[in-house]
Amino acid sequence: MGCHTRLLWLLFFHAAILPEAACYRRDFRGSGARLGKERPKRSSIQGVSEEQQEGHGEEPAARPQGDGNPATILSVLPAAISTQPSSKLAPSSSVSVLPVADSAPGSRRAHAPRINLKGADMLPDLTPVIDPESYKPSGGWAPVRLAGNHGSCAGRVELFYQGVWGTVCDDLWDLPQANIICRQLGCGWAVSALSEAYFGQGSGKILLDNVHCKGHEEHLEECSHLGWFSHNCDHSEDASVICSDAEYGTVTLSDPPLAAMEGATNPEKSRCGGVITSAPGKIKNPPMNEMHDNITCVWEIRASTSEHIRLAFPSLDLDCTNEYFEILDGPPSSTKSLGKPCRGLHITFASHSSSMTLVYFRGENNIGKNFMAYYYFEAKEMTTKTPYLITIPTATSKMVTERPQFSNTPSGNISPLPVSDSGDWPELRLVGGSSRCSGRVEILYQGVWGTICDDLWGSNEAEVVCRQLECGQAVSSLGEAYFGPGSGEIFLDNLQCSGMEHYLGQCPHSGWSEHNCGHHEDAGVICSDSDAPPPPMPPGPPPTPQDPLTGGSNSCGGVISSLSGSFTSPRYPENYPTDIQCVWEIHVEKNFRIELMIPNLNLEDILGCPYDSIEIFDGPRIASLSMGKFCAPSAVVFFSSSDILTVVFRSDYMTTNTGFYAFFNAIPQDGRESEERPVLRLAGSSGQCSGRVEILHQGAWGTVCDDLWDLNEAEVVCRQLGCGHAIAAPGSAYFGPGSGNILLDNIQCSGTENHFGQCSSSAWLDHNCGHHEDAGVICSDADVTPSPTEGSHSCGGVISNLSGSFSSPWYPTNYPTDTECIWEIHVAEKFNIELTIPSLK
């Protein structure tokens, strides 16, 4: 582990009751002055003039200059006068967090690349016109228009207020604000949030500044702002948007797309990976000195269960062979890939679930390039379309192709077919298999049958094919002309399905007959209703004489119904083929569960397993929890919670290895609960609900390694011990190193298990750790409440005081590595909370 400079922080909070006549919010975002321009300081108190504010305390802070650390302030006001209650508070809390202006150094948002609209001067003025005399606002909301002669869905944002049209300042302007404008105008969603008078300077009044939205608002005025006509801007900073329904001439990129945005992101999100739970925000590339060869960064974005996630790349220009992203519709264990973008303009993704994962890969001998991604949360009920990849019309976009040797030309635009309710989609058939539910996928287009290229072909696409053909669920998605090469046209390439579509025609693709493939890459599927096993792969070794297992399978996937058995990756122990996906679904009798053991696992071992992997699902693959995704050489053991277990094996188009050998046994359900429920204790602290996790095995106590250790595992420990829920999951021997054996490593829990024995892990005593990596937990019932006046060095806890302070562990010395702490602050019902972070390093 490399050495990094560690920064520290200290926080203070207090609860207060303020007069109900006004809602005072101090502007801590600072001055956004550009070089050579000095801005006057402005009031941030909505609806109160500068003269009226005399005597109300010190003047709002100027925008910070240089690299000073920001002070994070959560204004805490009586709940009764809060107009923007948070939607993410625990039900037991009445706390309302009011948004304040951005405090990032420099305070200016990132600016999107300049777009030239060719022929725009010849367009008629399509800006909506409202007669001030005849206008009567509906519901009291100000009308909105997009000006600048670029159509009704792209342009400078203008609002009609008190009889005049005016503009909006671009301070804090970003995708959540732009998305509300697009939604309000019926123009889809925001593709770009543009600033610095991108579509030309407006005239007249500047109506709003520091607009800050959460994303669920229906009108821009519902967002927090400085107040009508209160700003520190001029028309060179007018805000603009481009919506997804914009229709205008050729779009070209003329300015370096990311140079203007570099440094505008929160530094916490420029590291290589992490978990993100707040929005909106930006993710940028790690510092260049940290972008080593063969680096993989994994970011997981988590929204609430009522929201989904939108992600936008203003521009990508990566080496599509050795540097690209993969976007997963869910957590890192998700099998639903939304795409592998590497090059293009305004590439936008939408998740179907409440989480999304970005996997960034950079190979050898590659000069890493800058990138920036914007994300925000949106209520699920606002989504009316299946998630798909979309690009601005006539823009160029390129996805990673699965055959670099045939990638001589860009794959073209990726665009979805229009969705209709008629069900009039192209006809499909499966050819070359043993039944109508397995074979090479062929599609009827303009009266001719043709094939589909296997680039980006995966389980989502196979699932849609099986659904359209009424053949059950997808068992395998196969490439490389598994069922033999077809003939004639190759109609489709780079198909991208979410897995929820009813017809393959609803999935986006590169365009009819647009491909870079040959028939040796024809895609195939095996569906669950296939009445015969798939064509056999070259046989693997028979079980050893000591191994009594039967009912095994060396083919690529299938349904196994027996009390014991074995199966291997195709061609085992020789190298498995590239570009293949196999799904084994194991069924045992209803009163049994399944023990799965993989004693030998040799795949392409890359952090995060983005290429080759084996993933275990606790039940049928559809709608079952993932028990883990693995690619590192190790012995793993899993126990199902029901009579079904699913194993998914995937390989990509490049490196292969010898694969794996797996066997399973049926275990009676009645006996497993007591046999597999381990005895736990927490050591190294003063209470029973916080400490180093220790487990009893074969009469001796041992510790647990912190690899993959997080709140999910800690939650199960706290539940089993009756200690409430998990507040923190510290690693690095936070409670001191243990002694004796390290019993478990790579533990993976979903967080819903009743006891620790239901989580997957490496085998007993199989680890690569030392006691300096012992895992710990802090549960909500632990006695770690800080003093109301003195700082606490505990890692998390529940605080129930009217004022107090707390700090990062070991403050003011460096905090420990591999630690996650959660403090939950409770005050009286009629109070909200003000949180101040004067020192953050």
Swiss-Prot record:
Keywords: Disulfide bond, Glycoprotein, Repeat, Signal. The keyword Lipoprotein does not apply. Residues 1-23 form the signal peptide. Residues 532-546 have a biased composition (Pro residues). The keyword Ribosomal protein does not apply. Residues 85-105 have a biased composition (Low complexity). Residues 144-244, 428-528, 680-780 form the SRCR domain. Disulfide bonds join C169-C233, C182-C243, C213-C223, C272-C297, C320-C342, C453-C517, C466-C527, C497-C507, C556-C582, C609-C631, C705-C769, C718-C779, C749-C759, C795-C821. GO terms for cellular component: membrane. Glycans are attached at N294. Residues 32-69, 85-116, 528-552 are annotated as: Disordered. CDD domains: CUB (cd00041). Belongs to the DMBT1 family. This is Putative DMBT1-like protein. It comes from Mus musculus (Mouse). The gene is Cdcp3.
